[in-house]
Amino acid sequence: MNKTITPSLETIERNWFLVDAKDKTLGRLATEIATVLRGKNKPTYTPHLDTGDFVIVVNAEKVEVTGKKASQKLYRRHSGRPGGMKIEKFESLQERIPERIIEQAVKGMLPHNSLGRQQFKKLKVYKGADHPHAAQNPVLLNS
């Protein structure tokens, strides 16, 4: 009988990947990113451990959606105060804070617990083509 080997946190190797969001569909891009953040692309994947890699996303303002979602998709947030619900369309949020669009799409695809919050911290999203992580030597993610 074979024994299942659970990787220890010291043996997990974390790589850095770079993703260019220019002209990519939002949902398809988010699923690829979430898979890498969770570590499901590795043979050492373990559901209860954070085995994922770091992901850097550039050109967040150039991500696309299909159909009429650009004018119809709504993003909601609440201040916590009575009557504090704010509703914003995709187009206006893309002009104001384009990073938040990708962050919310990926966050919804990660586990909704402390492990998911830990994995989400490894996502770095930037508006333009520049990022401050050149020292990590990120590898371009095949997408």
Swiss-Prot record:
Keywords: Ribonucleoprotein, Ribosomal protein
A GO MF label: structural constituent of ribosome
Keyword Phosphoprotein found: no
Record-linked SUPFAM superfamilies: Ribosomal protein L13
InterPro entries named in the record: Ribosomal_uL13 (IPR005822), Ribosomal_uL13_bac-type (IPR005823), Ribosomal_uL13_CS (IPR023563), Ribosomal_uL13_sf (IPR036899)
CDD domains: Ribosomal_L13
GO cellular component term, pick one: cytosolic large ribosomal subunit
Annotated GO biological process: negative regulation of translation; translation
Function summary: This protein is one of the early assembly proteins of the 50S ribosomal subunit, although it is not seen to bind rRNA by itself. It is important during the early stages of 50S assembly.
Family membership: Belongs to the universal ribosomal protein uL13 family.
Family annotation (PANTHER family): LARGE RIBOSOMAL SUBUNIT PROTEIN UL13M, RIBOSOMAL PROTEIN L13
Listed NCBIfam families: rplM_bact
Assembly mode: Part of the 50S ribosomal subunit.
UniProt name for this protein: Large ribosomal subunit protein uL13
Native organism: Prochlorococcus marinus (strain AS9601)
